[in-house]
Design a protein with these regions (language model features):
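Non-globular targeting/processing and membrane-anchoring segments
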Residues: 2-121, 125, 143-145, 157-242
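Thiol-based oxidoreductase modules, predominantly thioredoxin-like and allied folds used
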Residues: 122-139, 150-161
């Protein structure tokens, strides 16, 4: 994206807005300020681009109706997929990597859920949210207690029916993020992340756009960036942390 030099849709050019910036910090060089204002123009363009993509996402036509009301197991017992909506019309559901074959939960998924646990009380004002994995519910409840995920709703998909339908048809233990809508009693698929590992750019791990994990977004603000070989761990105090 290059900063606009002409107005688009009534918006002032990003380069013009950046040029009007009066912010300065102690002892900064002219070289720094020139580079920072150039970056500011790109940040303005990025903000606008993100909104255009979000608007395009919101404008998606109705997705397919779910083929069946999946049977899951919640903390209080068996339940149907549709019940996860509660009194909301939109449901976000994250499928984490914690299948039966895994001895420990995925550290990256755990890092993501640590962020969700903090904001879910606000998100639930707008939509319903749940986390699923192909592990017994007792195992998920124990994981929830250990990590202090008191705000998150966990459900077990031991049969794999939901996971095969909307996450991975090959029964592989991979993460997934999907959004469903309920209108006039009908539950439809609205959105799922489709950026696969094959679509990753050289030198980068697969990632969504925008990245749903604020951990990586915050590291992008640092001089070191995300790093080439650093990943979250379950426990930084012991060696058994992967």
């Amino acid at each position: 994206m290059s900063p606009s030099t002409t107005e688009v849709g009534g918006l002032s050019p990003a380069s013009q807005l950046a040029a009007s910036n009066t912010v300065h910090f102690p002892n900064e060089s002219a070289e720094y300020r020139t580079a920072r204002n150039a970056l500011l123009a790109e940040e303005i363009e990025l903000r606008r681009y993100l909104e255009r993509v979000a608007a395009q996402r919101r404008a998606l036509p109705p997705g397919g109706e779910i083929p069946r009301d999946f049977e899951l197991v919640g903390e209080a017992g068996p339940l149907r997929f549709s019940s996860l909506f509660g009194d909301k019309n939109t449901l976000m559901i994250y499928s984490m990597m914690y299948g039966q074959a895994r001895k420990t939960p995925c550290p990256s998924c755990t890092s993501f859920l640590e962020a969700w646990n903090g904001i879910v009380v606000n998100l639930r004002e707008r939509c319903a949210i749940a986390v699923t994995a192909r592990s017994p519910i007792d195992r998920l409840i124990e994981y929830k207690k250990q990590r202090g995920f008191n705000n998150l709703l966990f459900v077990s998909d031991m049969s794999g029916d939901y996971t095969r339908t909307y996450v991975n048809p090959k029964d592989e233990d991979v993460p997934g993020f999907s959004v469903f809508s309920r209108r006039d009693g009908t539950v439809r698929h609205f959105y799922s992340g489709e950026l696969s590992g094959a679509m990753a750019d050289p030198g980068q791990d697969p990632r969504g756009a925008p990245d749903l994990n604020p951990l990586w977004t915050m590291l992008d603000f640092t001089p070191e960036g995300r790093g080439a070989d650093w990943y979250p761990k379950l426990d930084y105090k012991t060696q058994n942390s992967k």
